[in-house]
Amino acid sequence: MAHRPRWTLSQVTELFEKPLLDLLFEAQQVHRQHFDPRQVQVSTLLSIKTGACPEDCKYCPQSSRYKTGLEAERLMEVEQVLESARKAKAAGSTRFCMGAAWKNPRERDMPYLEQMVQGVKAMGLEACMTLGTLSESQAQRLANAGLDYYNHNLDTSPEFYGNIITTRTYQERLDTLEKVREAGIKVCSGGIVGLGETVKDRAGLLLQLANLPTPPESVPINMLVKVKGTPLADNDDVDAFDFIRTIAVARIMMPTSYVRLSAGREQMNEQTQAMCFMAGANSIFYGCKLLTTPNPEEDKDLQLFRKLGLNPQQTAVLAGDNEQQQRLEQALMTPDTDEYYNAAAL
């Protein structure tokens, strides 16, 4: 296997400093070398345990330390989760992501988490979880249950991280990613733009991700969703071009990874989202809720896909089939009919 050269901070900084149109052109070239530019991977995210998190992440409404009006909920019943997964598949998602607001799962929760993974896989969906810190044994148990992806974001650069979170170290996050990788689970890891970080911090985040022993298969890039009651509620808005630039640099640095538009799409107009796809984004969360923050309504996503000529990617999985995704793609490509406008209800 050929040695993969490591990125340097100066190289990443040079990318961020490129004229935007030159950067977009390079990112689109890289994207087309590794992906079908018309295909977008579609995921649905469900909060399986909401609120009362002991962590102090300053951006997060689920922290018990902030008064955001969010009601805490217990871990959902397995069948409730699987019913949501069925609806996600019916709406065209190929990956179902389950997130829990805690620092780490307890051993008594593991059998239920394993059942959720097994049930999602039995439907023919890819299964993803984000549960906080994992032990080696927990990572292996989830792998044995069939978990495809584990999400654990680095959030920002190591240098800026302490300004945002103090209850979990940066190294703890890196250690969890290593345990997940060693268990044979694909890694999903990214960060947030708009925390108050500098461009150098954005470069530092992408440097950490790209220089992992194996870069993440999926890289979610979030735009801060400012929630009243959190310490970052009054942060400055993120300039759309700065966000697009971050997407483009991520694409160039991690050419074979899926780059996902995650939180914050509700704040983006269609033109900004279109430029993100041009910059190399090829994955979205699809649905009305992104954990506890708004996400564009499904039908708006389908209409945007139609305008841009994008198709939801079909994903081969060990269990189930892609009949639903084929029906959704057919609906997307049939404009001006009831089938198209009701594609989300298929």
From Swiss-Prot:
[4Fe-4S] cluster binds at C53, C57, C60. Residues 38-256 form the Radical SAM core domain. Pathway: Cofactor biosynthesis; biotin biosynthesis; biotin from 7,8-diaminononanoate: step 2/2. The keyword NAD does not apply. Its EC number is 2.8.1.6. It catalyses: (4R,5S)-dethiobiotin + (sulfur carrier)-SH + 2 reduced [2Fe-2S]-[ferredoxin] + 2 S-adenosyl-L-methionine = (sulfur carrier)-H + biotin + 2 5'-deoxyadenosine + 2 L-methionine + 2 oxidized [2Fe-2S]-[ferredoxin]. Binds 1 [4Fe-4S] cluster. The cluster is coordinated with 3 cysteines and an exchangeable S-adenosyl-L-methionine. Binds 1 [2Fe-2S] cluster. The cluster is coordinated with 3 cysteines and 1 arginine. GO terms for molecular function: 2 iron, 2 sulfur cluster binding; 4 iron, 4 sulfur cluster binding; biotin synthase activity; iron ion binding. Homodimer. This is Biotin synthase. The lineage of its organism: Bacteria, Pseudomonadati, Pseudomonadota, Gammaproteobacteria, Enterobacterales.
